[in-house]
Amino acid sequence: MPGEFEPHEGTLMIWPWRPGSWNYGAKAARTAFAEIAEAIAAYEQVYLFVRPQDKASAQELLSSDRIHLIEAQTEDAWARDTGATFVINNQGGRRGIQLEFNAWGGQYDGLYSHFEHDREVPERICSFLGDSFYNARPFVLEGGSIHVDGEGTLLTTEECLLSPGRNPSLTRAEIEEKLRQYLSVEKIIWLPFGIYNDETNGHIDNMCCFVKPGEVLLAWTDDENDPQYARSRAAFDLLSHTVDAKGRSFVIHKLPIPKHPICITEEDLLGYDFEAGEDQREAGERLAASYINFYLANHCVLLPRFGDENDTVAAEILGKCFPNRRILPVDARVILTGGGNIHCITQQIPAKKRGNRL
């Protein structure tokens, strides 16, 4: 599996509509998704799944001829977790992987009950691209729960992959074997936790990611009274005393979380329509806001912006980590309120011929 920083053919996205995730008919969410899709399309192709009944709304907000609308039914818009994960062989052949999706926990603690259409996304995108795919089911794995360096190292969290709602019949060793088998990784590094109060059970893509092989960014706070502090400290200590698949020690860049916790307001709770059994938030609930949830498209970085003073700090740090990429801050509050962020709504489709990081 190539690193996200390697060249892409394009990016998979899904047009938002779910009334329990996106309020007031997803109007604000669609504006944010359109801004992100257009920004990515300046650098690579965008393959956007959209329900037939919502196609007109997408056409109204999108203009780039690099954005390809693909009619398909979906339950929600989290392309990172429902889309195919792609691998490349030494001859430049590309295949998707059809992993099992159970809405982040199935009957144990899943966020919604019906996800039949979400399960079809991997096969549909592979068919559209003309790629074959491996069927890895019933192994449950979301794209947001892993990060790879393209050289044999994988990052994940115990909090997520060992959650009872994922693969309760598999041991840790058996999960590692599945990851090695399908992603061709050699070393799996298990951080204990993800970001505090992450409803996905601590996805790695909110907590830690690769800048390049041997170099990572880690969500951080210096406030020892913040519940995130112990989580970040545990990850830092582990990363400081381990090596990657090639025997390299890690260079660790601390990327601060927002200085002020971002919480759900009473106003945020208006305009939703929930189905039976769907997860609902409460006013005052802290959201899992993290600048780590940026997305690396070709030649650019799409960085979530929260209206916090650390927005500028995060942009400066990423500018130093990715000097050859344009840093594009995007107002991401509406996506955060929906349950994720920029990385969660995008899934890279690697170029068939692997190359150096961009």
Explain the meaning of each model-derived region.
Residues M1-L358:
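Histidine/cysteine-enriched polar flanking segments
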